Design a protein with these regions (language model features):
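Sec-dependent N-terminal signal peptides
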Residues: 4-14
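C-terminal closing repeat unit and adjoining cap/tail of repeat-based domains
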Residues: 453-457
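Signature for the C-terminal beta-barrel architecture of outer-membrane proteins
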Residues: 138-140, 166-373, 385-393, 398, ...
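Boundary at the C-terminal end of the N-terminal hydrophobic targeting segment
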Residues: 18-20
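Outer-membrane beta-barrel "beta-signal"
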Residues: 214, 474-492
């Protein structure tokens, strides 16, 4: 069997080599950061930690994880295989041990391995997939590890790029249905692994999340309807992911958490309008035994004030490989935008971790707790999670070689978290549509500047200040980095 498999792989490689283009990836990013953000709980305590990680600071453990993995890798090494219909990406991204970025708050640090008394993060790879595109782009299929982002805004409510990667199988079919209208159907399967300790499965495991979406679009308008089914505590069957039927009432309430989502985007001249409405549960007054109402919503507007040339600098982060929706966003020139997000108290939640719409993550750390597992490390949907309201104002300008943007945001978040108990007592403790308990208010302002005289060579500088108005504390961040895509540079 092994010999036959090897022979098939050799034959496949020989066949595609006739039409394939092999593109090496050798990207370096070196940066220095000053960050006096207060540190949080470190190590195994995070497994049972709930809410704020520091009593004088607004961040939860999900915020710490997101911030750590948002920083670029020191080295991306691998290749991209490009054929007429089949593409493949194999990538190893070399980071510092991720716990260094959490432990070394309140000081200057870099992403270069073996500095700051740190070695390599062993949790890679975070990108690796193969995909297929049929003639005329009718069918698309992707299998592997990469990010996915659905939705027209900066942040998604259903599936977002708030986690480093998702192990997934992705299928799409797109077809014209009239002179102006197109129809698109997406089907996605996401796999998660839940472990407390070696050989011991976490409560509620296994976990598999399915999503399907029906979309209609024309040159000025898009609307999509999404349904997500999180199956936990059992191995899924065809009933759980049957492609066309609705999943919301498949008689598996004890093993299934279903979310529905609607997204709209429209273009009116130089203005883009967009919004989403997401529902996890909805309780009527006559239904006291159901789960509490859980909804999310977003709305935004973007104005292309002055048209211009789009920025041509290379994207070095793993998000360049993400599966993302098409958008009416106009790149280049001056853009002004405002976005609003609301996520109610009980969104994404269930009594066991595997039932929540979260992404688990296992860290292999040689400077921290060695093998460490967090079952609610990232939100599958909205970055800031349930019980939150978020405002984002952005002004950006970009041309061929540089771009600059200014951002101001206001976050309000209650004190009931995704890790809080989800039982009968807590389901009735808070008004499901109001921010729960004590509310933390956070104001942040910042600016980013990128200059790339050549597409694969550039520098980034960013500065931001965050003020926790509730706890009367603040943090300043300064980032400066240089990037070079060596393979791209040598090819030119």
């Amino acid at each position: 069997m092994k010999k036959a498999l090897v022979f098939i792989l050799i034959l496949f490689a020989a066949t595609i080599s006739l039409t394939a283009k092999l593109i090496p990836v050798l990207d370096f990013t070196a940066f220095l950061t000053f960050d006096n953000t207060p540190g949080g709980i470190e190590g195994f305590d995070w497994r049972s930690a709930n809410g704020l990680q520091n009593p004088q600071w607004w961040e939860t453990k999900q915020d710490y994880w997101y911030d750590a993995f948002e920083k670029p890798a020191f080295l991306n090494l691998g290749f991209e295989l490009d054929t007429d219909k089949v593409d493949m990406v194999v990538l190893v991204d070399v980071l510092q041990d991720i716990f260094v970025q959490i432990r070394d708050r309140e000081k200057i640090y870099t992403n270069i391995p073996f500095l700051n008394k740190a070695n390599l993060d062993l949790s890679f790879p975070r990108v690796g997939y193969i995909d297929y595109t049929s003639s005329e782009h009718l069918i698309y299929l992707s299998v592997g590890r990469r990010q996915i982002k659905w939705g027209p805004g900066t942040y998604g409510m259903a599936i977002s790029d708030s986690q480093p990667y998702l192990d997934n199988v992705y299928f799409n079919v797109t077809s014209g249905i009239s002179d102006r209208w197109k129809f698109s159907y997406d089907l996605v399967a996401l796999a998660f692994k839940h472990y407390l300790d070696i050989g011991e499965e976490a409560e509620g495991a296994p976990q598999t999340t399915f999503a399907h979406r029906f979309s209609f679009s024309n040159p000025n308008f898009r609307i999509s309807f999404t349904e997500m089914n999180n199956i936990y505590g059992k191995v899924p069957t065809f009933l759980d992911w049957t492609p066309i039927a609705l999943w919301h009432n498949n008689y598996q309430d004890d093993c299934s958490n279903v979310i529905v989502d609607m997204a709209i985007e429209a273009k009116l001249g130089s203005v883009r309008l967009f919004g989403t409405l997401t529902m996890d549960d909805f309780r009527l007054a006559e239904e006291p035994n159901t789960n509490p109402t859980a909804i999310g919503a977003s709305a935004g507007a973007e104005w292309n004030v002055i048209s211009g040339n789009p920025f041509l600098g290379k994207e070095f982060s793993n998000s360049r490989y993400a599966i993302k929706d098409e958008s009416f966003h106009v790149p280049g020139g001056l853009n002004l935008s405002y976005e609003f997000y609301y996520c109610s108290t009980y969104m994404y939640n269930r009594a066991v971790s595997a039932g929540k719409f979260t992404s688990d993550f296992q860290i292999n750390s040689n400077v921290g707790p060695k093998k460490f597992y967090d079952d609610d490390a990232f939100f599958l949907g909205f970055k800031y999670g349930p019980g939150s309201i978020f405002h984002l104002l952005s002004l950006s300008y970009e041309s061929t070689e540089y771009k600059i943007d200014f951002k101001a945001s206001l976050l309000q978040r209650g004190s009931y978290y995704i890790d809080s108990p989800y039982d009968d007592e807590y389901k009735s403790k808070y008004d499901p549509l109001r921010l729960p308990g004590d509310v933390t208010t956070v104001l942040s302002i910042g600016s980013d500047f990128s200059y790339y005289p050549q597409g694969g060579i550039g520098m980034d500088v960013s500065v931001s200040y965050t003020r926790d108005l509730t706890h009367d504390s603040g943090a300043f961040k300064l980032y400066a980095g240089v990037k070079i895509a060596i393979a791209d540079y040598l090819s030119h």
